[in-house]
């Protein structure tokens, strides 16, 4: 179903703001923990970006893919989806406290959070607000996480709140090493994100 695909893709929009990091992570793997801390501190300063890429979702009874445009400006987001989904396009916009999803030829849906919107429309409970961190190659700071670092002291895998995130490749853009290909594995749901163009920004407080 197109609407189901759109809403699942929309959880890329999570947007909980950029709070500080806690000390709730367990780190292992090849990398150097001190270098990882430096890398993490650098990425945490990114509070805006423009992303273009592709996203795919696979569930037991559903699958789909499409193109993704994601504009983030601190706590505001504008996410647009189109492509081989079969029936037009969708746009998700919002700030904390209000989320709006417009689907071509189907209508407008609103909620107070991405999580609420997802649960209202298809009945799934997912940690969607984590993705604003995961897409930058960071663990979300508000729950425990288990990290494995690669030889460059960047995330190789991340386990958090019942999800496993695999970082398959990175790209350097504007002095930042950012995820290029990400796979997310959760209960009965797999998501693949391939980022073709990263434009990170530091917008300030």
UniProtKB/Swiss-Prot annotation:
It comes from the Bacteria. The keyword Signal applies. It holds the Pfam family LolB. Residues 1-17 form the signal peptide. It is a lipid-anchor. It is found in: Cell outer membrane. InterPro entries: LolA/LolB/LppX, OM_lipoprot_LolB. A lipid is attached at residue 18 (S-diacylglycerol cysteine). One of its GO terms (cellular component) is cell outer membrane. Keywords: Cell outer membrane, Chaperone, Lipoprotein, Membrane, Palmitate, Protein transport, Signal, Transport. The keyword S-adenosyl-L-methionine does not apply. A lipid is attached at residue 18 (N-palmitoyl cysteine). Plays a critical role in the incorporation of lipoproteins in the outer membrane after they are released by the LolA protein. Monomer. This is Outer-membrane lipoprotein LolB.
């Amino acid at each position: 179903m197109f609407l189901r695909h759109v809403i699942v893709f929309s959880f890329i929009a999570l947007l909980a703001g950029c709070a500080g990091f806690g000390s709730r992570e367990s780190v292992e793997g090849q990398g150097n923990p001190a270098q990882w801390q430096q890398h993490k501190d650098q990425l945490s300063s990114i509070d805006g970006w423009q992303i273009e890429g592709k996203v795919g979702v696979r569930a037991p009874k559903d699958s789909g893919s499409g193109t993704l445009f994601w504009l983030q400006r601190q706590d505001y987001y504008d996410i647009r989806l189109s492509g081989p989904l079969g029936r037009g396009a969708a746009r998700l916009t919002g700030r904390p406290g209000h989320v709006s999803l417009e689907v071509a030829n189907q209508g407008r849906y609103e909620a107070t959070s991405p999580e609420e919107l997802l649960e209202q429309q298809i009945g799934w409970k997912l940690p969607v607000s984590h993705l604003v961190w995961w897409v930058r190659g960071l663990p979300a700071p508000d729950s425990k996480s288990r990290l494995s670092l690669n030889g460059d002291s960047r995330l190789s895998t991340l386990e958090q709140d019942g999800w496993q995130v695999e970082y398959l490749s990175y790209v350097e853009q504007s002095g930042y090493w950012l995820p290029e290909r990400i796979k997310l594995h959760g209960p009965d749901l797999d998501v693949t994100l391939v980022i073709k163009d990263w434009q990170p920004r530091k917008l300030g407080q």
